[in-house]
Amino acid sequence: MTKEVRVRYAPSPTGFLHIGGARTALFNYLYAKHHNGKFIVRIEDTDIERNVEGGEASQLDNLKWLGIEYDESIDIGGPYAPYRQMERLDIYKEHAEKLLAQGAAYKCFCSSEKLEASREEQKARGVAAPTYDGTCRHLSAEEVAAKEAAGEPYTIRMRVPENVTYDFEDLVRGQVTFESKDIGDWVIVKANGIPTYNYAVVLDDHFMEISHVFRGEEHLSNTPKQMMIFDAFGWEYPRFGHMTLIINENRKKLSKRDESIIQFVTQYKDLGYLPEAMFNFFALLGWSPEGEEEIFSKEEFIKIFDEKRLSKSPSMFDKQKLTWMNNQYIKKLSLEEVVALSLPHLQKAGLLPDELSAVQHAWATDLIGLYHDQMSFGAEIVELSSLFFKDHIEYDEEAKAVLAGEQVPEVMAAFKAQLEELEEFTPDAVKAAIKAVQKATGHKGKNLFMPIRVVTTGETHGPELPNAICLIGKEKAIDRVEKFAQ
């Protein structure tokens, strides 16, 4: 590849970093780094009314958190600055005037009411996709001047060439073709002087020397409009690649209103998902490596990334796979790292104080250690460890079935007696106490362990029993046995 690879992720600050945007950014990043190229983040902020406070920061901060490092953007600058569209208005204005001068564009004075009436009339005739009817396309220079002199507001429209076929080799889906007759003259500059997306993006891509454009499938129909602008100026197209949709488990297109899936990167961060796991998961959301392996480091992904393996079929957002993958990464963490990940969630839930004594921190560390290999994300520790913070235990049907055994009263009475005699309350001491109960009662296996587990923890499954009872504490464990006996 002779020309330097330069790709871009160009979000609008109309919302926070979405999983779809994160995937787009990631594939662009991997492609650039695989080819020793540059990854640019450009902010497309011309939709002023819809821009939200914190939108820009969410995009940049969460990309950094994911480990998607960009080479040029609004915060670090670069040779093609500015990287914010509202700071590039002079460029768009200058080139719109060039398009007007060469007749490739024209001023349109049609009111929104007239345009709406035209759309409705076309729909009534059965036109599936109404287009502009061309009212102002043939205005003379004198007519245009008169309307301007009268102060009539206008937009600038692209004069769509007649009988032109726009075809290109899409890097994901192969040959794609559009016909100019299906497009209609479209607005490149709105009445307020702000450029539209399909116009501004071409100028930005050209002047920033973007070589490849990887983006979502929803942008496919924008491509012929953008090709018109490139053609009008005699500029070379970048290579285009349109990634398939992300779908939910019902195989429906992922919508931001779909509450069955957490959709924003910052939400995963807040729940205690790991950035390395999210990076790994997003990389496999519409791309597949050779072989069966699914866990890769960032460096490995950069080395093996091949755009030819981008999927042509919709990509399902598999929540269970993400949970499994995050657990694989949590297992690799040290105990200290797992504590740093999950302890704040216990504190936020009000289960532990914000300021911990050395004894409290040691207890919390042991508690979290019990669930190290089981934990799927940091916040899950609150649910996993709930048995340690309950004042009152309620037994479910499975637990009640265990406690219905004839041997249970004898086992629990013996266990209570053993607990009361313990001077040191350690896992080894509790283990010895359980063995003593076995010896005294003759009960063993599930008939011994299950009643003790259910009465002391309220659960039929859980972490290593002596360790759990030790963390519950002698006084609380005895209290739970006594309440059961009542």
UniProtKB/Swiss-Prot annotation:
<keyword id="KW-0030">Aminoacyl-tRNA synthetase</keyword>
<protein>
    <recommendedName>
        <fullName>Glutamate--tRNA ligase</fullName>
        <ecNumber>6.1.1.17</ecNumber>
    </recommendedName>
</protein>
<keyword id="KW-0648">Protein biosynthesis</keyword>
<keyword id="KW-0479">Metal-binding</keyword>
<keyword id="KW-0067">ATP-binding</keyword>
<dbReference type="InterPro" id="IPR033910">
    <property type="entry name" value="GluRS_core"/>
</dbReference>
<dbReference type="InterPro" id="IPR049940">
    <property type="entry name" value="GluQ/Sye"/>
</dbReference>
<feature type="binding site">
    <location>
        <position position="110"/>
    </location>
    <ligand>
        <name>Zn(2+)</name>
    </ligand>
</feature>
<dbReference type="GO" id="GO:0006424">
    <property type="term" value="P:glutamyl-tRNA aminoacylation"/>
</dbReference>
<keyword id="KW-0963">Cytoplasm</keyword>
<feature type="binding site">
    <location>
        <position position="138"/>
    </location>
    <ligand>
        <name>Zn(2+)</name>
    </ligand>
</feature>
<comment type="subunit">
    <text>Monomer.</text>
</comment>
<dbReference type="GO" id="GO:0004818">
    <property type="term" value="F:glutamate-tRNA ligase activity"/>
</dbReference>
<dbReference type="InterPro" id="IPR020058">
    <property type="entry name" value="Glu/Gln-tRNA-synth_Ib_cat-dom"/>
</dbReference>
<feature type="binding site">
    <location>
        <position position="256"/>
    </location>
    <ligand>
        <name>ATP</name>
    </ligand>
</feature>
<dbReference type="GO" id="GO:0000049">
    <property type="term" value="F:tRNA binding"/>
</dbReference>
<dbReference type="GO" id="GO:0005524">
    <property type="term" value="F:ATP binding"/>
</dbReference>
<keyword id="KW-0547">Nucleotide-binding</keyword>
<dbReference type="InterPro" id="IPR008925">
    <property type="entry name" value="aa_tRNA-synth_I_cd-bd_sf"/>
</dbReference>
<dbReference type="InterPro" id="IPR004527">
    <property type="entry name" value="Glu-tRNA-ligase_bac/mito"/>
</dbReference>
<dbReference type="GO" id="GO:0008270">
    <property type="term" value="F:zinc ion binding"/>
</dbReference>
<feature type="binding site">
    <location>
        <position position="136"/>
    </location>
    <ligand>
        <name>Zn(2+)</name>
    </ligand>
</feature>
<keyword id="KW-0436">Ligase</keyword>
<comment type="similarity">
    <text>Belongs to the class-I aminoacyl-tRNA synthetase family. Glutamate--tRNA ligase type 1 subfamily.</text>
</comment>
<feature type="short sequence motif" description="'HIGH' region">
    <location>
        <begin position="11"/>
        <end position="21"/>
    </location>
</feature>
<feature type="short sequence motif" description="'KMSKS' region">
    <location>
        <begin position="253"/>
        <end position="257"/>
    </location>
</feature>
<comment type="function">
    <text>Catalyzes the attachment of glutamate to tRNA(Glu) in a two-step reaction: glutamate is first activated by ATP to form Glu-AMP and then transferred to the acceptor end of tRNA(Glu).</text>
</comment>
<dbReference type="GO" id="GO:0005829">
    <property type="term" value="C:cytosol"/>
</dbReference>
<feature type="binding site">
    <location>
        <position position="108"/>
    </location>
    <ligand>
        <name>Zn(2+)</name>
    </ligand>
</feature>
<dbReference type="InterPro" id="IPR014729">
    <property type="entry name" value="Rossmann-like_a/b/a_fold"/>
</dbReference>
<dbReference type="InterPro" id="IPR000924">
    <property type="entry name" value="Glu/Gln-tRNA-synth"/>
</dbReference>
<dbReference type="InterPro" id="IPR020751">
    <property type="entry name" value="aa-tRNA-synth_I_codon-bd_sub2"/>
</dbReference>
<dbReference type="Pfam" id="PF00749">
    <property type="entry name" value="tRNA-synt_1c"/>
</dbReference>
<dbReference type="InterPro" id="IPR001412">
    <property type="entry name" value="aa-tRNA-synth_I_CS"/>
</dbReference>
<dbReference type="InterPro" id="IPR045462">
    <property type="entry name" value="aa-tRNA-synth_I_cd-bd"/>
</dbReference>
<dbReference type="Pfam" id="PF19269">
    <property type="entry name" value="Anticodon_2"/>
</dbReference>
<keyword id="KW-0862">Zinc</keyword>
